[in-house]
C-alpha cells in the first residue's frame, strides 16, 4: 500500500515532465516551421522555372514611387537591382565613390521633395556612405539607401564583406530593415519610403541579401547541393536548405501594391495658430527666420513665397530657404542678423534652430516673444530655458503654418520704419564689403572681388552648390541664389566633400539649370575624381575653385591662437589641368588675367552650354574678411 502511494507522486512528476518535454518539442517544431515558412508554403508555391529576380521587385517599387535616378557604385551584391532599374527606365548613374552616390541622392531629395535613392554593395561599400547618411540625417533629407549583403544563411559565418550593417546604420536612420524573403521586398521598401518622408524627414536603410536579389536557379545552385545526400545528417541538412530556399521564393511573384503609402505630416492646431496670430498682431518689430524645413512638401515654394510677402514681416533666410524671395526683395535682409534679433520684439523661428548657428539661443533677446515652429520637438526646443524661452512652441509643418498665419493676420500692417532700420544696416554692411573688394592682397586675386563678379555674372536659372570653408563662407555673404531651392550646402553638419554629389543630383533634377559649384581648394580634393563621372555621363556642371593653397578657415584661427600653421598648408595645384586629364575643360584665373574674370566665367558658361563639365581654377590671396569666423 505504501509502495503504491509513494509511486503516485513519482508518476505524476514523470507525466508532467513528459508533457513539458512534449510541449517544448512541439513549440520548437512550430517555431522551426514558422522560420522556414512551412505553413506559408502550403498556400503559396515556388515557381522554380522562373528566371525573375528580386531586383525586379525593387525596381518596380522605385518606379511606382516616381524615382527617376538611382545613384550607385557597382558591386556584385546589387547587380540585379541595377539591371532591373535600367530596364524600367530609371537612370542608373555610377559614381567613383559611394559617398558621392548618397550625396547625389540627398540633392535629389532636397530639390524634388521626394525620396532620393542610392544603392551600394555590402561591407566597405556601405561603410563608405556613413558620412553622407549622417549628413542627410542632420539635414533632414529623405534618402533611401539600398545595401547589398551576404546571403541570409551565410551571415555571421565569415562570408565576404559580411558585417552587422543594421547595427551600423540604426543610429543614423529613421528606419532600418533587412529583407529575408523575396516576397518581403515590396512591403519593406514601401514602408521605408513612407518613413523617410513622414514626420521629420530623414534617411532610411534597407539591406538586400544576395539570395533575395538573384533568381531562383542561381540561388539554388549555390545553396542546395546537387548530389543527393546519403547519411541521416546530410539528409537533414539537405531538407533544411531546400526548405530555406523554398521559403525565400514562396509567393515571390504574386501581385502586391507597389505605390506610395500615406504620409504622416504633423500640423499646427488651430488653437496654436490663433495664439501665434495674437502675439504677432501686437508686435511692433516682428522678425522671421526661415529655415530649410519651410520648403518641405506639401507647401510649394511659390505658395510659401506669396505667404511671406503677404505677411509683410522682415525676414532672414537660411539653408534651402535662401533665395525664397529672389534678389533684393524689400522684406529680405542678409546682414547684421544678430543685431536685428536683439532689437525685435517678436521673433518667429520658422524651421530655424537655436544651435551653434544662433549661438545656442544667446542671440535672442530675453525681452522678445519667441514663436518656434518645427516638425521635430527635440530640435524645436534645443537649448530652451537655458539661453532662451519660447512663448509658443508649435510642433508641425513649417510651410503650412506660415500659410495659416496669413489667414489669421490678413490686413495686418507693420510700421515701415522697422524695415527701413534693417535696410540701412544692410546697406552699410554691403558698403563695407565693397571696400574690402578693392583692398590689395599679397598675391593673386582678391576673393571678395572675385565673388562680387560671380554675383554679377550668375544667371537667373542657376543652382548654387557650395562646398568649402573660407571661400564658401565668404560667398554666403556676397552671392545670392536667384530663387528658392537654388542653394545647396551640406547643412548643420558642415560636411566637406558634398560638392560633386550635390552637383550631380542637381543637374539631373534640373537639366535646364546652370549648376555653379563654389569650392574651396581643400574641399575640391574630395570631388576631383567625380569629373570622370560628369564626363562619362555627359553632365555639364561648372566648378569655381577658390584656390588659396590652404585650409584657410582653420589657418586663420590656428596661427594667431596656437602659433603654428601645421597641417593647414596646401599647394597652388593645377586643378584645371587635373580636370582636363579626366576629360573635362579646365580654365585658370590668376593675377596675370585678373581683368578677364568675367570673360573667363562666360567662357566656362559656354563650355557647359555645349555639354562639357568645366573647372575654373581661381588663384586667390588672403583677406581678413572672415577673421573670427570659426563656430565653437
Curated annotation (Swiss-Prot):
Organism whose genome encodes this protein: Bos taurus (Bovine)
Disulfide bonds: none
TM regions (residue ranges): 10-30
Role according to the record: Endoplasmic reticulum 2-OH acyl-CoA lyase involved in the cleavage (C1 removal) reaction in the fatty acid alpha-oxydation in a thiamine pyrophosphate (TPP)-dependent manner. Involved in the phytosphingosine degradation pathway.
InterPro entries, per the entry: DHS-like_NAD/FAD-binding_dom, THDP-binding, Thiamin_PyroP_enz_cen_dom, Thiamin_PyroP_enz_TPP-bd_dom, TPP-bd_CS, TPP_enz, TPP_enzyme_TPP-bd
Lineage: Eukaryota, Metazoa, Chordata, Craniata, Vertebrata
E.C. number(s) listed in UniProt: 4.1.2.-
Catalytic activity, as annotated: 2-hydroxyoctadecanoyl-CoA = heptadecanal + formyl-CoA; (2R)-hydroxyhexadecanoyl-CoA = pentadecanal + formyl-CoA
Alphabetized Gene3D superfamilies for the sequence: 3.40.50.970, TPP-binding domain
The name this protein goes by in its record: 2-hydroxyacyl-CoA lyase 2
Binding, thiamine diphosphate: 98
Broadest EC class assigned to this enzyme: lyase
One annotated GO biological process: fatty acid alpha-oxidation
Cofactors that this protein relies on: Mg(2+); thiamine diphosphate
Keywords assigned by UniProt, alphabetized: Endoplasmic reticulum, Fatty acid metabolism, Lipid metabolism, Lyase, Magnesium, Membrane, Metal-binding, Thiamine pyrophosphate, Transmembrane, Transmembrane helix
GO MF, one example: thiamine pyrophosphate binding
Topology relative to the membrane: Single-pass membrane protein
Note on cofactor: Binds 1 Mg(2+) ion per subunit.
Subcellular location: Endoplasmic reticulum membrane
Family designation: Belongs to the TPP enzyme family.
Top-rank taxon: Eukaryota
Record has RNA-binding as a keyword: no
Presence of the UniProt keyword Lyase in the record: yes
Gene that produces this protein: ILVBL
Region Thiamine pyrophosphate binding, annotated ranges: 470-550
Annotated Gene Ontology cellular component terms: acetolactate synthase complex; endoplasmic reticulum membrane
Main subcellular localisation: endoplasmic reticulum
Residues the entry annotates as binding Mg(2+): 521, 547
Amino acid at each position: 500500500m505504501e509502495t503504491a502511494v509513494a509511486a503516485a507522486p513519482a508518476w505524476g512528476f514523470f507525466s508532467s515532465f513528459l508533457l513539458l518535454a512534449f510541449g517544448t518539442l512541439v513549440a520548437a517544431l512550430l517555431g522551426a516551421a514558422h522560420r522556414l515558412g512551412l505553413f506559408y508554403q502550403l498556400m503559396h508555391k515556388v515557381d522554380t522555372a522562373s528566371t525573375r529576380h528580386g531586383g525586379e521587385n525593387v525596381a518596380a517599387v522605385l518606379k511606382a514611387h516616381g524615382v527617376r535616378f538611382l545613384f550607385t557604385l557597382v558591386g556584385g551584391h546589387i547587380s540585379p537591382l541595377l539591371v532591373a532599374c535600367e530596364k524600367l527606365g530609371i537612370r542608373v548613374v555610377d559614381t567613383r565613390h559611394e559617398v558621392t552616390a548618397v550625396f547625389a541622392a540627398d540633392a535629389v531629395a532636397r530639390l524634388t521633395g521626394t525620396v532620393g535613392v542610392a544603392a551600394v554593395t555590402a561591407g566597405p561599400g556601405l561603410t563608405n556612405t556613413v558620412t553622407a547618411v549622417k549628413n542627410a540625417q542632420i539635414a533632414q533629407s529623405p534618402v533611401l539607401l539600398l545595401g547589398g549583403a551576404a546571403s541570409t544563411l551565410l551571415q555571421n559565418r565569415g562570408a565576404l564583406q559580411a558585417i552587422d550593417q543594421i547595427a551600423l546604420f540604426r543610429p543614423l536612420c529613421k528606419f532600418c530593415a533587412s529583407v529575408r524573403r523575396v516576397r518581403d521586398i515590396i512591403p519593406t521598401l514601401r514602408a521605408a519610403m513612407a518613413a523617410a518622408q513622414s514626420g521629420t524627414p530623414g534617411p532610411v536603410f534597407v539591406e538586400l541579401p544576395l539570395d533575395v536579389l538573384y533568381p531562383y536557379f542561381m540561388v539554388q545552385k549555390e545553396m542546395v547541393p546537387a548530389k543527393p545526400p546519403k547519411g541521416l545528417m546530410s539528409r537533414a541538412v539537405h531538407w533544411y536548405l531546400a526548405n530555406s530556399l523554398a521559403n525565400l521564393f514562396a509567393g515571390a511573384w504574386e501581385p502586391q501594391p507597389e505605390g506610395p503609402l500615406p504620409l504622416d505630416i504633423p500640423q499646427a492646431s488651430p488653437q496654436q495658430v490663433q495664439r501665434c496670430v495674437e502675439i504677432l498682431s501686437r508686435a511692433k518689430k516682428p522678425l522671421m527666420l526661415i529655415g530649410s524645413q519651410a520648403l518641405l512638401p506639401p507647401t510649394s515654394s511659390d505658395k510659401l513665397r506669396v505667404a511671406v510677402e503677404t505677411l509683410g514681416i522682415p525676414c532672414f533666410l537660411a539653408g534651402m530657404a535662401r533665395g525664397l524671395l529672389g534678389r533684393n526683395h524689400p522684406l529680405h535682409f542678409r546682414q547684421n542678423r544678430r543685431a536685428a534679433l536683439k532689437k525685435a520684439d517678436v521673433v518667429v523661428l520658422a524651421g530655424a534652430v537655436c544651435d551653434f548657428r544662433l549661438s545656442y539661443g544667446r542671440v535672442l533677446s530675453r525681452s522678445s516673444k519667441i514663436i518656434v515652429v518645427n516638425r521635430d520637438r527635440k530640435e524645436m526646443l534645443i537649448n530652451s530655458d537655458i539661453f532662451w524661452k519660447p512663448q509658443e512652441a508649435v510642433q508641425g509643418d513649417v510651410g503650412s503654418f506660415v500659410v495659416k498665419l496669413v489667414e489669421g493676420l490678413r490686413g495686418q500692417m507693420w510700421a515701415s520704419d522697422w524695415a527701413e532700420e534693417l535696410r540701412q544696416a544692410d546697406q552699410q554692411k554691403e558698403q563695407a564689403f565693397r571696400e574690402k573688394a578693392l583692398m590689395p592682397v599679397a598675391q593673386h586675386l582678391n576673393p571678395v572681388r572675385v565673388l562680387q563678379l560671380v554675383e554679377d555674372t550668375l544667371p537667373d536659372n542657376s543652382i548654387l552648390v557650395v562646398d568649402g570653408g573660407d571661400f564658401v563662407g565668404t560667398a554666403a555673404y556676397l552671392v545670392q541664389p536667384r530663387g528658392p531651392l537654388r542653394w545647396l550646402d551640406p547643412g548643420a553638419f558642415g560636411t566637406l566633400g558634398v560638392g560633386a554629389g550635390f552637383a550631380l543630383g542637381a543637374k539631373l533634377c534640373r537639366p535646364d539649370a546652370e549648376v555653379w559649384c563654389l569650392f574651396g581648394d581643400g574641399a575640391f580634393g574630395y570631388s576631383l575624381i567625380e569629373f570622370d563621372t560628369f564626363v562619362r555621363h555627359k553632365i555639364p556642371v561648372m566648378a569655381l575653385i577658390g584656390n588659396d593653397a590652404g585650409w584657410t578657415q582653420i589657418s586663420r584661427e590656428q596661427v594667431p591662437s596656437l602659433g603654428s600653421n601645421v597641417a593647414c598648408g596646401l599647394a597652388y595645384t593645377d586643378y584645371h589641368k587635373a580636370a582636363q586629364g579626366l576629360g573635362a575643360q579646365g580654365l585658370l584665373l590668376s593675377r596675370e588675367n585678373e581683368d578677364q574674370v568675367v570673360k573667363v566665367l562666360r567662357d566656362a558658361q559656354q563650355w557647359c552650354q555645349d555639354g562639357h563639365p568645366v573647372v575654373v581654377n581661381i588663384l586667390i590671396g588672403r583677406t581678413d574678411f572672415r577673421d573670427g569666423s570659426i563656430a565653437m
